[in-house]
Amino acid sequence: MITLKNNNGIPKYTQIIQSIEKAIEQKVLQLNEKLPSINKVVLTHNISRDTVLQAYDELKKRGVIYAILGKGYYVKSTEIKPKKRFFLLFDELNIFKEDLYNSFLKTIGSEAEIDLYFHHFNTNQFKKLIQESKGNYNKYIIMPTNLIEATESIKTLPHKDVFILDQTNPDLLQFPAVYQNFVKDIYDGLAKGKQHLQRYSKLILIFPGFREPIGLKIGFERFCHDFNFNHEIIADFTDINVIQNCVYIIPSDRDLVQVIEQAKRQKLQLGVDYGIISYNETPLKKLVENGITTISTDFETMGKTLAEMILKNSKTQIENPSRIIIRNSI
């Protein structure tokens, strides 16, 4: 009746809950029928007593079973509504992804249990997490970023249960998604700030190319070509000086700190001697150097939209809104 698997990523107490609910659904367990005793489950599966107690207590809270002191646990209800389980695979945790996650949780409410994982831009870790999650969840919400072979791994999951988040690509068009249009977002953002940019001699994009979406580079080059801006793309900002009268477009917050620190060593004033446009809005960027200009998608909206899509069982692809926030830095 109770089936437990090792190394499948699901806690043992959760597997006990799922097994009992499944037994009730399949009428293996009937109303008022006695469950296996705690001691029996402990001995049969070689697990701790606390693990079994945790599972039985949770089933009591859900109104599925009841206890009679000194006798055991019994089926209280055969009307089982198993809680849905969602697999969330993010690239990394930062302040704006945390905003996304919290917004998603707030909108999804108590509809599901959420298991959050991170692949940290590691292809092997991504593939491993996908493989181990198969068959264990009702929905799979995935940030594939620009990982090689990500599409192949995603396609091994049940197609009807997969949702793509943040970055997508032409190979994933069959899946519903809430995504950033990186080409359009950086192009439109720079175009709206064009009046401020025209007083600078060059735009410089710091683009390492490992984690950054290729769409940023494409949109940047397209904007500079269309509006005749002198421009340059560099892979990193290590051991070089800040060039006066240039605007640095900086996707990475690590590079943002490096540029500001180097400019201070050169005694350059931000917004006067050089400019900065950072990617992704955070509360701190309102305050640093009297305000850093940002181009950013709305991560709270992204989380809310995704949750609403799942609740409505919508299968569309939705482009998340983005905007430029002009501040002192340009």
Report the location of each language-model feature.
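Extreme N-terminal segment that seeds HTH/winged-HTH DNA-binding domains in transcriptional regulators
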Residues: M1-L43
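Flexible loop/turn connectors
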Residues: R254-I330
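N-terminal helix-turn-helix
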Residues: Q30-A67
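Flexible loop/hinge segments that line or gate small-molecule binding clefts
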Residues: N146-K184, N280-N290
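Periplasmic-binding protein-like
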Residues: F87-L88, N136-T145, K202-P208, Q244-S252, ...
